[in-house]
């Protein structure tokens, strides 16, 4: 996973609004509040499939994080695993532009 994506993810968490976890991410997708969804590569396939489905309905970009849920948790500076997260407000981060523009 690109160090730039990790840095921008940390900036979004610090300066914007981000929800962690599959259930909260799904809730934000269903309510059309998520601007970007990030899911760990090793998340269970049914979770990835469901998040991709709801992301397509709300036309929300989804990024499959190239690391494990443990690595995604570490990238978020959390002492626990994170299978999915939703960015509601990127704050000072450029992560939305990086994902939409391909980095």
Language model features: what each stretch is:
Residues 41-45:
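Acidic, metal-coordinating catalytic cores used for nucleic-acid/nucleotide bond scission
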Residues 39-40, 64, 87:
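Small/polar loops that bind or transfer phosphate-bearing groups
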Residues 4, 46, 50, 67, ...:
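Charged, alpha-helix-enriched surfaces in structured cytosolic catalytic cores
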Residues 10-14, 30, 56, 77, ...:
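Signal for well-folded cores of large energy- and translation-related assemblies
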Residues 1-39:
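N-terminal first-folded block
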Residues 7, 27, 31, 49-53, ...:
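Solvent-exposed alpha-helical segments within well-ordered globular domains of core cellular machineries
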Residues 70-103:
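C-terminal structural segments of small proteins and small subunits
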Residues 49-81:
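Mid-chain, well-packed structural core segment of small domains
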């Amino acid at each position: 996973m690109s160090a730039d994506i990790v840095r921008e993810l940390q900036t979004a968490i610090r300066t914007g609004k981000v929800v962690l976890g599959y259930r909260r991410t799904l809730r934000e997708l269903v309510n059309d509040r998520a601007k970007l969804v990030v899911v760990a590569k090793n998340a269970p396939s049914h979770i990835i499939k469901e998040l991709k489905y709801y992301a397509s309905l709300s036309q929300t970009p989804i990024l499959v994080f190239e690391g494990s849920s443990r690595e995604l948790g570490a990238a978020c500076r959390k002492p626990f695993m994170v299978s999915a997260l939703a960015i509601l407000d990127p704050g000072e981060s450029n992560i939305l532009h990086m994902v939409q523009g391909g980095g």
